[in-house]
């Protein structure tokens, strides 16, 4: 467990350590810290894997109108910076990315505020050179844990 916690903590605290590198496709957030204003929030629990271990995770989503504009991931007491929604031209995923140089990214299956509590997540990763390093994978909705959250 120490090894996994160390990886998660490193990924969430690398904003100052990793240089910003150009991605294959530029992703422009729908909102950023300077213009962030949400109407409501929804917290969802997931069960993810890494190194054949199951790790619980929660994500707090910020909602503006009928759009999910920001996500904040919590794993083992560590909280990510705001991960801002970026458009996916193919509408295959909901993509949330850090506005800082660390390139932390959270992806989920397509969801709206109305379907968040019924939709599986995907991967939590961070930029490592020219590719992404996966922190948590196969994040599945944990309905029982989600039901216990204060929403």
Predicted regions and their residues:
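N-terminal signal peptide c-region/cleavage motif recognized by signal peptidases
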Residues: 17-19
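Beta-sheet ligand-binding and adhesion/scaffold domains
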Residues: 93-151
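N-terminal secretory signal peptides
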Residues: 23-86, 128-151
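Bacterial N-terminal signal peptides that target proteins for export
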Residues: 1-11
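An exposed acidic His-Trp-rich patch
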Residues: 75-103
């Amino acid at each position: 467990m120490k090894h996994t916690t160390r990886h998660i903590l490193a990924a969430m605290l690398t904003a100052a350590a990793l240089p910003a590198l150009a991605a294959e496709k530029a992703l422009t957030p729908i909102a950023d810290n300077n213009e962030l204003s949400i109407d409501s929030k929804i917290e969802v629990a997931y069960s993810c894997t890494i190194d054949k271990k199951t790790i619980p995770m929660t994500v707090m989503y910020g909602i503006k109108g009928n759009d999910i504009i920001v996500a904040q991931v919590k794993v083992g007491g560590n909280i990510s910076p705001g991960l801002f929604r970026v458009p996916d031209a193919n509408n295959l995923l909901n993509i949330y990315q850090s506005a800082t140089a660390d390139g932390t990214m959270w992806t989920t299956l397509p969801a709206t505020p109305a379907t968040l509590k019924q939709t599986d997540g995907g991967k939590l990763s961070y930029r490592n050179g020219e590719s992404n390093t996966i922190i948590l994978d196969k994040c599945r909705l944990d309905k029982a844990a989600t039901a216990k959250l204060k929403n």
